[in-house]
Amino acid sequence: MKIKSKWFVIFIAAVLIIGTAHYVFAAQNDGSQESAITLEEVVVTATKTPEKRKDIPNAVIIIDKKDIQASGAKSIGELLANETGIDWQTYGNYGGANQEIHIRGMRGNATQVLVNGVNVGSPSLGIADVGKISIDNIERIEIVKGSGSLLYGSGAMAGTVNIITKRPKRDKMDMKVGAGYGSQNTYRVAAENGMFVAGNFGYYLTAGRTETDGFRDNSYLRQNDASLKLVLDKKDIIDISLYGDYINRKYGMPGVKPPSGTRDYYIGGEKFYNSEAAALLDHSGDKDGHVVLEVKGKPVKWFGYDLKGHYTNMENHNYERYAYNGSGYENWVTNQVLGTDGHVDIYPFEGAKLLLGGEYKNFDWKNEGFDLDTTGKQTVKTTNEAQIFTKSAFTEAEYRPSQYLKALAGFRHENNSAFGSQNLPLFGLVINPFETTALKINHGKHFLAPTPNDLYWPAGPYTRGNADLKPEIGWHTDVTLEQSLLNDKLFMTISYFHWNVDDKIQWEPDSQGVFTPINLASYKADGLEVGTRIGPFYDLTLALSYTYTDAEEENREYTRQDYGWPPFIPPDFQYSMVKRRASYTPDNQFKGDLTYKSNFGLTVTATARYVGDRVVYRTETTTYPDTKTVTYTLNSYWTADLKVQQRLYKHWILSLSGINLFDKEYDTHLTTFTDQTTWKTSPAMYPGAGRSVFASVAYEF
C-alpha cells in the first residue's frame, strides 16, 4: 500500500523532530519531575495492572472527569469522536441510533468496550452500542490501541475502550442533582450520590431519565438508567466492589430519509412512510443489566491479585413492518453471559513482573420471533436457542533492566466451543531515552469469533446462519512516540500502525441465493496518528488530533445475480474478487479543541471536527439478471461545537452547549428506498443531525 513508504518516512522524520525538541526545551524543564506528569499517568487497561503511561508499549488515550465536563458531550460517542485513531459511527444520530466506536479503520466489532473491565458488547451482534452507557456515571475512560486479544480475547483487534465508573471518596460526600432541556424537546434529569458510610464501606449511586423527540419523525428516545457501586476498601490488603447497572429504553427506527418529493404512504389507514422517514412504524427497545463482583489487592510487595465474577442479561426487542404489503417481523433476542476471570501478578525481583490469568464465559442466546400479517398481527412463531462457552489461559512477562528499556511478551490460549482454539502471542518494547520520552513498539495477533447471529440465525427463505464459520484472525503492529515538555504544558504523540485480517466474516448470497455469513476474504490498513496538547498558557489550552487511514478490503463484485426458480431453475451468481478502498472508512479525520478556563469559574470549549469522504459500494441490476458494482461517495464535512460552563457560589453549575452550530448537512450511511407508488428504487441516506442546543443546571454538594 502507498502509505508504507511515504507515510512511514514521514513518521520517522517526525520522530527525529520530536526527539530533537527534547534538547531544545530541556533547559526550560530544569530537570523537574513535574515535566513528566503526562507520562506518569497510571493506566490499568493495557496490562490489567496499574502501569505508568511511559511503561506500556501501546498508544493510549486517557479522558478523565474534568475532560468530560469541559467537552459538553452528552454521549460517549460525542466525547470520543475524532480523537486520534477514533471514528464514531452512527446510523443518523437520532435518539436511539446505534453508536459504534471504530479504531484505526476497523469495524465496530473489532473494538472491545468494557465497563469496569467487563465486556458490555452485545454477544449476538459482536458490537457495543456506547449510546447505552450513561456519561454521568463515568470517572475515567482508558483507550488502548493495538491488539488486545492477549488479555481480552475475541473482538479486541483494533483496541480496547475501558470505562471506569465513579466510586466513593474517603472523607468526602459526593452529591449532584441536575436537569437540562434543549432542541427537539430533549430533556435529561439525573442525580448521583456517593460516600463512605461506615469505616471502609461506601457506595456510589446514579440515576437518570432521558427523553427526546429526535430531529426526524419516529426518531424518539425514552430512557431510564441507574447504577450502584458498593465498595469495601481496605487499601492494599483487599478491595471488594459490587457494581450493577440497568437501562430500559424504547426508541423509534426511522430508517433512511426518502428522496425529496416523497409523499405520505398508507396501508389500511396506517402511515408507513413520509418525506422525513422511510419507516414510521418500526421501533426497538433494550433492557440491559450487568452485575460485577471484583476482589483485588496487593497484600505484599511481590504479589497482587484481581478476581472478577460477572453476569449480563440483555434483551433487545425489534418491531418491523414492510411497506410493500404491510406484513412484518417482530422478535426478541436475549443474551445471557455468566463469566469469571482473574489474574495474579508476581514481582520476583526488581524490574520484573509476571502475570498469570484465566477466563471463562458461558453465553446463552435465544431468538424468539413472529411473522406479522398485513395488519401487523403475530402469526407464525419461531424460536432458536444456542449456547457457547469459552475458556482461556494467558500469561504476560515484563522486564525493565534499566530506566531506558523495558520488554514485554505474552501468550494466550483460548478454546471456543463453536470453532476450536486460538493461540495469541504479543510482543512489546518501550525505550525511554529521556525521562519525558517514550518510544513504544508492539506486535500482536488478534482474532474475532463469529457471533451467535452469524452461527445460528434462523433458516428462512432469504437468510440463515452458518455453523461452520471460522474466526477472523490477523496481526496488529504499531510504533508510537510520546514526548512531554515544558512541565507538561506541551505533550506530543505520533503513531504509525499496520494491521491485517484474514477470513473476514460477511453476509453474502450462497449458491441458492440465500444470504448467509461466510469467511470471505481479507482486509488491511496502514495509518498515521498525530496529536498534541498545548497549555494552559494565559488560561488557554489547545488540543489537536489528526488521523490518516489507508484501509483496503477484498470483496466480491457481482456481474450476475440470477435467483432462478428452485428447484426447477438453479440460481446463478457470478462475481470476481477485487481489492478496493474500504467502505465507510474516511482517509482523513481531524479534531481541534480550544478551552478557556478562568479563575472565576468560567470554562469555554470550542471544538471543530473534520471527517473525510467515505465510499460505499452497492450491487445494482443493469438488465436482469446482469449486475454491476456502483461506487457512491459520502461527502466530507466539518462541524463546530461550543460549550460554556459557569460555576457559581462553589455549588451551582450552569451549562450551555451547541452541537453542529452551523447546521452542516452530512450523511452517515447509505442504502436504498423503494417508493411503493412508483416502484422506483433509489439510493437514500441516513442523515446526520443538524444544529442542536442544550442548557442545563446542576447543584453539587
Language model segments and positions:
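Outer-membrane beta-barrel signature, preferentially recognizing the C-terminal barrel domain
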Residues: 265-298, 386-388, 432, 436-438, ...
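Short acidic/polar hinge/loop motifs at secondary-structure boundaries
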Residues: 118-145, 163-164
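Face-selective signature of the C-terminal outer-membrane beta-barrel domain
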Residues: 233-247, 284-421, 432-434, 490-496, ...
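Conserved C-terminal beta-signal and adjacent last beta-strands/turns
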Residues: 8-12, 21, 231-233, 298, ...
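Gram-negative outer-membrane beta-barrel transporters
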Residues: 400-406, 497-500, 519-620, 698-700
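Extracytoplasmic beta-strand/coil segments of soluble accessory domains associated
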Residues: 77, 81-118, 139
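Transmembrane beta-barrel wall of Gram-negative outer-membrane proteins
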Residues: 181-211, 216-254, 281-304, 348, ...
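Surface-exposed extracellular loop regions of Gram-negative outer-membrane beta-barrel proteins
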Residues: 256-264, 417-423, 431, 435-478, ...
